[in-house]
Regions:
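Residue at a conserved register position within TPR or TPR-like alpha-solenoid repeats
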Residues: 14, 48-49, 83, 117-118, ...
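Residue-level recognition of tetratricopeptide repeat
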Residues: 3, 37, 72, 106-107, ...
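Catalytic core of non-heme Fe(II) oxygenases with the double-stranded beta-helix
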Residues: 259-269, 273-367, 372, 377-378, ...
Protein backbone atom coordinates (compact mmCIF):
# COMPACT_ATOMS: atom_id res chain seq x y z
CA UNK A 1 0.00 0.00 0.00
CA UNK A 2 1.42 3.37 -1.06
CA UNK A 3 1.53 6.42 1.20
CA UNK A 4 -1.44 8.00 -0.60
CA UNK A 5 -3.64 4.96 -0.07
CA UNK A 6 -2.49 4.71 3.53
CA UNK A 7 -3.74 8.24 4.18
CA UNK A 8 -7.16 7.39 2.75
CA UNK A 9 -7.40 4.26 4.89
CA UNK A 10 -6.37 6.29 7.93
CA UNK A 11 -8.99 8.97 7.20
CA UNK A 12 -11.76 6.40 6.75
CA UNK A 13 -10.82 4.73 10.01
CA UNK A 14 -10.88 8.08 11.81
CA UNK A 15 -14.28 8.84 10.36
CA UNK A 16 -15.67 5.46 11.43
CA UNK A 17 -14.55 6.28 14.95
CA UNK A 18 -16.31 9.65 14.85
CA UNK A 19 -13.09 11.69 14.63
CA UNK A 20 -14.19 13.86 11.73
CA UNK A 21 -11.84 16.79 12.40
CA UNK A 22 -8.83 14.50 12.25
CA UNK A 23 -10.18 12.67 9.19
CA UNK A 24 -10.65 15.96 7.36
CA UNK A 25 -7.12 17.08 8.20
CA UNK A 26 -5.67 13.82 6.87
CA UNK A 27 -7.64 14.09 3.62
CA UNK A 28 -6.58 17.71 3.11
CA UNK A 29 -2.98 16.64 3.55
CA UNK A 30 -3.52 13.84 1.02
CA UNK A 31 -4.92 16.08 -1.73
CA UNK A 32 -2.24 18.72 -1.19
CA UNK A 33 0.43 16.06 -1.38
CA UNK A 34 -1.17 14.54 -4.50
CA UNK A 35 -3.55 17.07 -6.12
CA UNK A 36 -4.48 14.51 -8.77
CA UNK A 37 -5.62 11.86 -6.28
CA UNK A 38 -9.26 11.43 -7.27
CA UNK A 39 -10.23 9.06 -4.46
CA UNK A 40 -8.91 11.43 -1.79
CA UNK A 41 -10.77 14.34 -3.38
CA UNK A 42 -14.00 12.35 -3.47
CA UNK A 43 -13.69 11.35 0.19
CA UNK A 44 -12.92 14.94 1.20
CA UNK A 45 -15.90 16.36 -0.69
CA UNK A 46 -18.16 13.72 0.90
CA UNK A 47 -16.86 14.44 4.40
CA UNK A 48 -17.05 18.23 4.23
CA UNK A 49 -20.50 18.08 2.62
CA UNK A 50 -21.93 15.81 5.29
CA UNK A 51 -20.49 18.08 7.99
CA UNK A 52 -21.49 21.45 6.54
CA UNK A 53 -23.93 21.15 3.64
CA UNK A 54 -21.83 23.90 2.01
CA UNK A 55 -21.18 23.11 -1.65
CA UNK A 56 -18.44 25.73 -2.07
CA UNK A 57 -16.55 24.58 1.02
CA UNK A 58 -16.93 20.94 0.00
CA UNK A 59 -15.50 21.57 -3.46
CA UNK A 60 -12.76 24.07 -2.48
CA UNK A 61 -9.74 21.74 -2.65
CA UNK A 62 -10.90 20.07 -5.86
CA UNK A 63 -11.72 23.41 -7.48
CA UNK A 64 -8.22 24.64 -6.60
CA UNK A 65 -6.66 21.51 -8.10
CA UNK A 66 -8.60 22.04 -11.34
CA UNK A 67 -7.52 25.69 -11.53
CA UNK A 68 -3.90 24.63 -11.06
CA UNK A 69 -4.13 21.85 -13.68
CA UNK A 70 -6.86 22.77 -16.19
CA UNK A 71 -5.67 20.11 -18.64
CA UNK A 72 -6.13 17.30 -16.10
CA UNK A 73 -9.29 15.81 -17.57
CA UNK A 74 -9.68 13.26 -14.77
CA UNK A 75 -9.81 16.05 -12.20
CA UNK A 76 -12.28 18.03 -14.29
CA UNK A 77 -14.52 15.00 -14.75
CA UNK A 78 -14.47 14.34 -11.00
CA UNK A 79 -15.33 18.00 -10.42
CA UNK A 80 -18.33 17.78 -12.77
CA UNK A 81 -19.65 14.63 -11.08
CA UNK A 82 -19.23 15.95 -7.55
CA UNK A 83 -20.78 19.33 -8.34
CA UNK A 84 -23.96 17.49 -9.21
CA UNK A 85 -23.70 15.40 -6.05
CA UNK A 86 -23.58 18.49 -3.80
CA UNK A 87 -26.60 20.08 -5.44
CA UNK A 88 -24.94 22.42 -7.93
CA UNK A 89 -26.50 20.93 -11.04
CA UNK A 90 -26.07 24.24 -12.88
CA UNK A 91 -22.31 24.22 -12.42
CA UNK A 92 -22.16 20.50 -13.14
CA UNK A 93 -23.96 21.05 -16.45
CA UNK A 94 -21.53 23.82 -17.41
CA UNK A 95 -18.55 21.65 -16.47
CA UNK A 96 -19.81 18.73 -18.53
CA UNK A 97 -20.48 20.94 -21.55
CA UNK A 98 -16.93 22.26 -21.37
CA UNK A 99 -15.51 18.75 -21.07
CA UNK A 100 -17.49 17.48 -24.05
CA UNK A 101 -15.30 19.68 -26.26
CA UNK A 102 -12.20 17.79 -25.04
CA UNK A 103 -11.09 14.19 -25.69
CA UNK A 104 -13.23 13.16 -22.69
CA UNK A 105 -16.29 13.88 -24.80
CA UNK A 106 -15.44 11.01 -27.12
CA UNK A 107 -16.36 8.52 -24.39
CA UNK A 108 -20.04 7.60 -24.82
CA UNK A 109 -20.40 6.85 -21.12
CA UNK A 110 -19.22 10.36 -20.34
CA UNK A 111 -21.82 11.63 -22.81
CA UNK A 112 -24.47 9.80 -20.79
CA UNK A 113 -23.36 11.68 -17.68
CA UNK A 114 -23.41 14.94 -19.64
CA UNK A 115 -26.95 14.20 -20.80
CA UNK A 116 -28.21 13.61 -17.27
CA UNK A 117 -26.53 16.82 -16.12
CA UNK A 118 -28.23 18.74 -18.93
CA UNK A 119 -31.84 17.53 -18.64
CA UNK A 120 -32.89 20.18 -16.11
CA UNK A 121 -31.08 23.02 -17.89
CA UNK A 122 -30.91 22.29 -21.63
CA UNK A 123 -33.06 19.33 -22.71
CA UNK A 124 -32.06 19.80 -26.36
CA UNK A 125 -28.39 19.33 -25.43
CA UNK A 126 -29.38 16.39 -23.23
CA UNK A 127 -31.03 14.66 -26.19
CA UNK A 128 -27.99 15.31 -28.39
CA UNK A 129 -25.57 13.86 -25.83
CA UNK A 130 -27.79 10.85 -25.16
CA UNK A 131 -28.34 10.10 -28.82
CA UNK A 132 -24.60 10.17 -29.45
CA UNK A 133 -24.06 7.74 -26.56
CA UNK A 134 -26.86 5.41 -27.67
CA UNK A 135 -25.52 5.36 -31.24
CA UNK A 136 -22.03 4.52 -30.01
CA UNK A 137 -23.35 1.80 -27.67
CA UNK A 138 -26.05 -0.07 -29.61
CA UNK A 139 -27.89 -2.47 -27.35
CA UNK A 140 -26.68 -0.80 -24.15
CA UNK A 141 -29.82 -0.57 -22.01
CA UNK A 142 -28.49 2.19 -19.79
CA UNK A 143 -27.67 4.39 -22.79
CA UNK A 144 -31.14 3.73 -24.17
CA UNK A 145 -32.75 4.75 -20.87
CA UNK A 146 -30.72 7.96 -20.75
CA UNK A 147 -31.99 8.82 -24.22
CA UNK A 148 -35.57 8.15 -23.13
CA UNK A 149 -35.13 10.37 -20.06
CA UNK A 150 -33.82 13.20 -22.22
CA UNK A 151 -36.75 12.89 -24.62
CA UNK A 152 -39.24 13.09 -21.73
CA UNK A 153 -37.50 16.24 -20.49
CA UNK A 154 -37.64 17.75 -23.97
CA UNK A 155 -41.39 17.24 -24.30
CA UNK A 156 -41.01 14.35 -26.73
CA UNK A 157 -42.66 11.59 -24.72
CA UNK A 158 -44.23 10.15 -27.87
CA UNK A 159 -40.70 9.33 -29.04
CA UNK A 160 -39.43 8.29 -25.63
CA UNK A 161 -42.25 5.86 -24.82
CA UNK A 162 -41.50 3.21 -27.49
CA UNK A 163 -37.80 3.42 -26.68
CA UNK A 164 -38.34 2.61 -23.02
CA UNK A 165 -40.97 -0.03 -23.84
CA UNK A 166 -38.32 -1.89 -25.85
CA UNK A 167 -36.05 -1.87 -22.80
CA UNK A 168 -38.88 -2.98 -20.51
CA UNK A 169 -39.53 -5.99 -22.74
CA UNK A 170 -35.97 -7.15 -22.00
CA UNK A 171 -35.94 -6.40 -18.25
CA UNK A 172 -39.61 -6.52 -17.16
CA UNK A 173 -38.85 -6.48 -13.42
CA UNK A 174 -36.34 -3.63 -13.45
CA UNK A 175 -37.80 -1.08 -11.03
CA UNK A 176 -36.05 1.91 -12.59
CA UNK A 177 -37.22 0.98 -16.07
CA UNK A 178 -40.77 0.45 -14.79
CA UNK A 179 -40.68 3.93 -13.25
CA UNK A 180 -39.49 5.44 -16.52
CA UNK A 181 -42.12 3.56 -18.54
CA UNK A 182 -44.85 4.70 -16.15
CA UNK A 183 -43.70 8.30 -16.53
CA UNK A 184 -43.78 8.04 -20.32
CA UNK A 185 -47.25 6.46 -20.23
CA UNK A 186 -48.59 9.17 -17.94
CA UNK A 187 -47.27 11.85 -20.28
CA UNK A 188 -48.81 10.19 -23.34
CA UNK A 189 -52.13 9.31 -21.69
CA UNK A 190 -51.52 5.58 -22.01
CA UNK A 191 -53.96 3.58 -19.81
CA UNK A 192 -51.15 1.22 -18.81
CA UNK A 193 -50.01 3.96 -16.43
CA UNK A 194 -52.94 3.30 -14.12
CA UNK A 195 -52.15 -0.41 -14.09
CA UNK A 196 -48.80 0.43 -12.51
CA UNK A 197 -49.95 3.38 -10.39
CA UNK A 198 -53.09 1.89 -8.88
CA UNK A 199 -52.74 3.68 -5.57
CA UNK A 200 -55.75 2.05 -3.94
CA UNK A 201 -54.37 -1.41 -4.67
CA UNK A 202 -50.67 -0.82 -4.16
CA UNK A 203 -50.26 1.80 -1.40
CA UNK A 204 -51.15 0.22 1.92
CA UNK A 205 -49.88 -0.87 5.30
CA UNK A 206 -50.86 -0.46 8.92
CA UNK A 207 -49.64 -0.01 12.47
CA UNK A 208 -46.71 -2.15 13.50
CA UNK A 209 -47.24 -4.66 16.31
CA UNK A 210 -46.13 -4.02 19.88
CA UNK A 211 -42.95 -6.08 20.28
CA UNK A 212 -42.54 -8.49 23.15
CA UNK A 213 -40.98 -6.70 26.11
CA UNK A 214 -42.89 -3.42 25.74
CA UNK A 215 -46.22 -2.53 27.32
CA UNK A 216 -47.60 -0.53 24.40
CA UNK A 217 -46.62 1.03 21.08
CA UNK A 218 -45.89 4.47 22.54
CA UNK A 219 -43.42 3.03 25.04
CA UNK A 220 -41.71 1.04 22.32
CA UNK A 221 -41.41 4.04 19.99
CA UNK A 222 -39.75 6.08 22.76
CA UNK A 223 -37.02 3.45 23.04
CA UNK A 224 -36.72 3.12 19.27
CA UNK A 225 -36.28 6.89 18.91
CA UNK A 226 -33.45 6.80 21.46
CA UNK A 227 -31.76 3.93 19.63
CA UNK A 228 -31.97 5.69 16.26
CA UNK A 229 -30.76 9.01 17.64
CA UNK A 230 -27.50 7.34 18.61
CA UNK A 231 -26.96 6.53 14.92
CA UNK A 232 -27.78 9.94 13.45
CA UNK A 233 -24.41 11.55 14.08
CA UNK A 234 -23.80 13.40 10.81
CA UNK A 235 -24.87 16.99 10.38
CA UNK A 236 -26.44 16.98 6.92
CA UNK A 237 -27.59 14.85 4.01
CA UNK A 238 -25.31 12.22 2.49
CA UNK A 239 -24.02 12.55 -1.06
CA UNK A 240 -25.89 10.46 -3.58
CA UNK A 241 -29.01 9.91 -1.46
CA UNK A 242 -32.51 11.36 -1.67
CA UNK A 243 -32.34 13.15 1.71
CA UNK A 244 -32.20 16.95 1.84
CA UNK A 245 -31.61 18.80 5.13
CA UNK A 246 -31.41 15.65 7.17
CA UNK A 247 -29.29 12.62 7.90
CA UNK A 248 -29.41 8.98 6.86
CA UNK A 249 -27.84 6.16 8.85
CA UNK A 250 -24.71 4.68 7.33
CA UNK A 251 -25.10 0.98 7.99
CA UNK A 252 -27.82 -1.61 7.45
CA UNK A 253 -30.14 -1.56 10.45
CA UNK A 254 -30.69 -5.30 10.05
CA UNK A 255 -27.20 -5.76 11.46
CA UNK A 256 -27.60 -3.33 14.35
CA UNK A 257 -27.61 -5.19 17.69
CA UNK A 258 -29.74 -2.69 19.60
CA UNK A 259 -32.77 -4.58 21.02
CA UNK A 260 -35.24 -1.86 20.03
CA UNK A 261 -34.00 -1.84 16.44
CA UNK A 262 -34.04 -5.62 16.17
CA UNK A 263 -37.56 -5.68 17.61
CA UNK A 264 -38.70 -3.40 14.80
CA UNK A 265 -38.17 -6.11 12.20
CA UNK A 266 -40.42 -8.45 14.18
CA UNK A 267 -43.01 -5.72 14.68
CA UNK A 268 -43.42 -5.05 10.94
CA UNK A 269 -44.23 -8.66 10.07
CA UNK A 270 -47.95 -8.29 10.80
CA UNK A 271 -48.65 -5.31 8.48
CA UNK A 272 -46.37 -6.77 5.79
CA UNK A 273 -48.24 -10.08 5.71
CA UNK A 274 -51.60 -8.30 5.74
CA UNK A 275 -50.47 -6.22 2.75
CA UNK A 276 -49.28 -9.30 0.83
CA UNK A 277 -52.54 -11.13 1.55
CA UNK A 278 -54.55 -8.17 0.26
CA UNK A 279 -52.54 -8.01 -2.97
CA UNK A 280 -53.95 -11.22 -4.33
CA UNK A 281 -52.75 -12.77 -7.58
CA UNK A 282 -52.14 -11.15 -10.96
CA UNK A 283 -49.73 -10.76 -13.85
CA UNK A 284 -48.73 -7.14 -13.15
CA UNK A 285 -45.12 -6.40 -12.06
CA UNK A 286 -46.08 -6.46 -8.37
CA UNK A 287 -48.40 -9.46 -8.07
CA UNK A 288 -46.59 -11.76 -10.48
CA UNK A 289 -43.57 -11.83 -8.15
CA UNK A 290 -45.62 -12.48 -5.01
CA UNK A 291 -44.60 -15.58 -3.05
CA UNK A 292 -45.67 -16.98 0.27
CA UNK A 293 -42.92 -15.10 2.06
CA UNK A 294 -40.65 -12.10 1.84
CA UNK A 295 -37.14 -10.99 2.73
CA UNK A 296 -36.05 -7.57 3.97
CA UNK A 297 -33.19 -6.41 1.75
CA UNK A 298 -31.58 -3.46 3.48
CA UNK A 299 -32.95 -1.02 6.07
CA UNK A 300 -31.99 2.49 7.09
CA UNK A 301 -33.27 5.47 9.07
CA UNK A 302 -33.74 9.09 8.00
CA UNK A 303 -33.93 12.10 10.30
CA UNK A 304 -35.40 15.18 8.57
CA UNK A 305 -35.01 18.60 10.15
CA UNK A 306 -37.47 21.46 9.50
CA UNK A 307 -36.99 22.48 5.88
CA UNK A 308 -36.01 18.94 4.99
CA UNK A 309 -37.52 16.56 2.48
CA UNK A 310 -36.87 13.53 0.32
CA UNK A 311 -36.43 14.27 -3.36
CA UNK A 312 -38.66 12.06 -5.48
CA UNK A 313 -37.03 8.73 -6.22
CA UNK A 314 -37.54 4.99 -6.66
CA UNK A 315 -35.73 1.97 -5.21
CA UNK A 316 -34.05 0.02 -8.04
CA UNK A 317 -33.05 -2.92 -5.83
CA UNK A 318 -36.45 -3.59 -4.28
CA UNK A 319 -39.76 -5.19 -5.14
CA UNK A 320 -41.75 -3.43 -2.43
CA UNK A 321 -40.51 -0.44 -0.45
CA UNK A 322 -41.62 1.13 2.79
CA UNK A 323 -41.64 4.09 5.12
CA UNK A 324 -42.45 3.90 8.81
CA UNK A 325 -42.65 7.13 10.78
CA UNK A 326 -41.17 6.69 14.24
CA UNK A 327 -41.51 10.30 15.33
CA UNK A 328 -43.68 12.87 13.52
CA UNK A 329 -46.41 15.41 14.27
CA UNK A 330 -49.89 14.03 13.71
CA UNK A 331 -52.03 17.17 13.37
CA UNK A 332 -50.80 18.74 10.13
CA UNK A 333 -53.48 19.28 7.49
CA UNK A 334 -51.44 21.22 4.91
CA UNK A 335 -49.53 18.12 3.69
CA UNK A 336 -46.21 19.59 4.88
CA UNK A 337 -43.87 16.68 5.55
CA UNK A 338 -46.34 14.13 4.17
CA UNK A 339 -45.27 11.17 2.08
CA UNK A 340 -46.19 11.80 -1.56
CA UNK A 341 -46.47 9.56 -4.60
CA UNK A 342 -46.45 10.01 -8.35
CA UNK A 343 -44.21 13.03 -8.94
CA UNK A 344 -41.27 11.90 -11.08
CA UNK A 345 -37.78 12.54 -9.82
CA UNK A 346 -36.66 13.59 -13.29
CA UNK A 347 -37.60 16.63 -15.39
CA UNK A 348 -40.57 16.23 -17.72
CA UNK A 349 -42.37 18.51 -20.12
CA UNK A 350 -45.05 19.16 -19.05
CA UNK A 351 -44.18 18.96 -15.35
CA UNK A 352 -46.00 16.19 -13.50
CA UNK A 353 -47.21 16.66 -9.92
CA UNK A 354 -47.81 14.25 -7.05
CA UNK A 355 -51.12 12.37 -7.14
CA UNK A 356 -51.39 10.77 -3.70
CA UNK A 357 -50.40 11.97 -0.22
CA UNK A 358 -50.07 9.97 2.99
CA UNK A 359 -50.26 11.66 6.39
CA UNK A 360 -47.44 10.63 8.78
CA UNK A 361 -48.51 8.63 11.82
CA UNK A 362 -45.97 7.34 14.34
CA UNK A 363 -45.81 3.56 14.19
CA UNK A 364 -47.64 3.25 10.88
CA UNK A 365 -45.85 1.30 8.14
CA UNK A 366 -46.60 2.35 4.55
CA UNK A 367 -45.84 -0.14 1.76
CA UNK A 368 -45.76 0.46 -1.98
CA UNK A 369 -44.09 -0.85 -5.17
CA UNK A 370 -40.39 -0.02 -5.43
CA UNK A 371 -40.92 1.43 -8.92
CA UNK A 372 -43.38 4.03 -7.62
CA UNK A 373 -42.04 7.58 -7.50
CA UNK A 374 -42.18 8.85 -3.93
CA UNK A 375 -40.75 11.58 -1.75
CA UNK A 376 -41.81 13.90 1.04
CA UNK A 377 -43.35 17.34 0.82
CA UNK A 378 -41.07 19.95 2.42
CA UNK A 379 -41.95 21.26 5.88
CA UNK A 380 -40.56 24.46 7.34
CA UNK A 381 -41.71 24.45 10.96
CA UNK A 382 -42.53 22.07 13.76
CA UNK A 383 -40.85 18.89 14.97
CA UNK A 384 -38.55 16.72 12.94
CA UNK A 385 -39.60 13.58 11.04
CA UNK A 386 -37.78 10.37 12.03
CA UNK A 387 -38.41 7.30 9.88
CA UNK A 388 -37.21 3.78 9.15
CA UNK A 389 -37.36 2.50 5.59
CA UNK A 390 -36.53 -0.82 4.00
CA UNK A 391 -36.96 -2.76 0.78
CA UNK A 392 -38.63 -6.14 0.40
CA UNK A 393 -37.89 -8.84 -2.15
CA UNK A 394 -39.93 -12.00 -2.69
CA UNK A 395 -39.04 -14.93 -0.44
CA UNK A 396 -39.96 -18.57 -0.27
Amino acid sequence: MGPDSALIVQARDLRRRGLSDQAEAVLRAAVRQRPDHLEAHRDLVQLVWTRTGDAAASMAELDAAVRASPDALGLRAAQARLLGAVGRSDLAHAAYESLCATPAGADPRFRMEASRAAVAHDPVAAVAHARQAATALPGDLRATCVLAEALLAAGRADEGAPIIEAVLAKVPDDQGVLALAATAWRLTGDPRYRDLYDYDAFVGGGLIAVPSGWSDLSAYLVDLVAALDRLHTRETDPIGQSVRLGTQTRHDLLRDPDPAIQAFFRAVDTPIRAYLDALGQGDDPVRRRRRSGYRIAGAWSVNLRPGGFHIDHVHPEGWLSSACHIEAPVGDDDRAGWLKFGQPGLPTKPRLEAERFQRPQPGRLVLFPSYMWHGTAPFTTGPRRLTIAFDLVPGA
